[in-house]
């Protein structure tokens, strides 16, 4: 819902006529969340067989999602079913619309990462795959420390230390460190593959490899990385790159709970919108 809230809060300045969100299941314990989004100016839709239940919860403005599909110019799918929804729903809609899916839906469309390849939005395509948070993080590190400075990157290695689940979730918590298998012999996990494909769209071929492990924490993903360059590089130069970056932030904090707490207290909807937060003393 932070994305819905952001778009609704700024719809006038963004030139949006309406912000419509789809809620599948009417749950009384989520009434407050829906009320908050409606107060911001967003409109709720659902399937025909659940609209009456939303009306019973007090959301008399709830309407049919099928009409929303017809009326909307841009459809953003934030579910792990984006590819299935394309096959079953979106492919039959007006193809002048723009369709976006989350990072898990590999193959949905061209990779897009904000601040990394904005120019892809100008291409004649109607399907975009929004890169995941880890893909944004890795791509921004590669772009900031290598590509933007025209340094020849020999190799990039990454270990994604992933949170078990989000603080908003009760399910899928991992009680112990759990390793993610290397499903790709060239890239390891999908994280390096996704970043490689993102830059390959621009004709750049990068030697990247990633591993991942899920840890019993709900705070934030953490990334370990090692970049090897052809030529020697000075620590001062790297720090200058970090401090001048628009999308990477620097911090003196050394624990994810401290960074998470700062974002909760000062971030938009309690979120940090930077691609990554780099602990200065770790470089």
Q: Language model features by range: what are they?
A:
Residues 2-5, 82-86, 137-140:
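Short glycine/serine/threonine-rich phosphate/pyrophosphate-binding segments
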Residues 2-63, 152-155, 159-160, 165-283:
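C-terminal substrate-binding/catalytic lobe of Rossmann-fold NAD(P)-dependent oxidoreductases
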Residues 110-182, 186:
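Rossmann-like dinucleotide-binding core of oxidoreductases
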Residues 67-69:
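Structural alpha-helical scaffold elements that stabilize or flank donor/cofactor-binding regions
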Residues 81-126:
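Rossmann-fold NAD(P)-binding glycine/threonine-rich loop
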Residues 72:
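An anion/phosphate-binding loop that grips the pyrophosphate of nucleotide cofactors and donors
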């Amino acid at each position: 819902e932070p994305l819905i809230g952001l778009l609704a809060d700024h719809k006038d300045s963004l030139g949006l006529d309406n912000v419509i969100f789809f809620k599948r299941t009417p749950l009384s314990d989520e009434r407050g969340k829906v009320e908050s989004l409606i107060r911001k100016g967003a409109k709720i839709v659902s399937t025909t067989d659940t609209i009456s239940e939303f009306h019973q919860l007090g959301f008399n403005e709830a309407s049919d999602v099928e009409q929303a599909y017809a009326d909307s110019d841009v459809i953003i799918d934030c579910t792990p079913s984006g590819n299935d929804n394309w096959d079953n729903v979106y492919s039959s809609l007006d193809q002048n619309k723009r369709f976006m899916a989350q990072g898990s839906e590999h193959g949905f469309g061209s990779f897009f990462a904000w601040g990394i390849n904005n120019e892809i939005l100008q291409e004649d395509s109607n399907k975009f795959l929004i890169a995941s948070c880890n893909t944004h993080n890795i791509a921004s590190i590669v772009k900031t420390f290598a590509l933007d400075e025209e340094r020849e990157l020999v190799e990039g290695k990454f270990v994604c230390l992933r949170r078990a689940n989000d603080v908003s979730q009760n399910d899928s918590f991992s009680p112990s460190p759990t390793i993610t298998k290397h499903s790709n012999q060239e890239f390891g996990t999908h994280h390096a593959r996704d970043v490689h494909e993102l830059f390959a769209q621009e004709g750049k071929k990068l030697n990247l490899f990633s591993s991942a492990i899920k840890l019993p924490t709900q705070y934030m993903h953490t990334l370990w990385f090692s970049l090897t360059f052809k030529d020697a590089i000075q620590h001062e130069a790297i720090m200058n790159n970090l401090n001048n970056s628009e999308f990477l932030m620097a911090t003196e904090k050394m624990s994810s709970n401290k960074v998470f707490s700062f974002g909760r207290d000062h971030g938009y909807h309690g979120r940090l919108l930077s691609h990554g937060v780099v602990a200065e003393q770790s470089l």
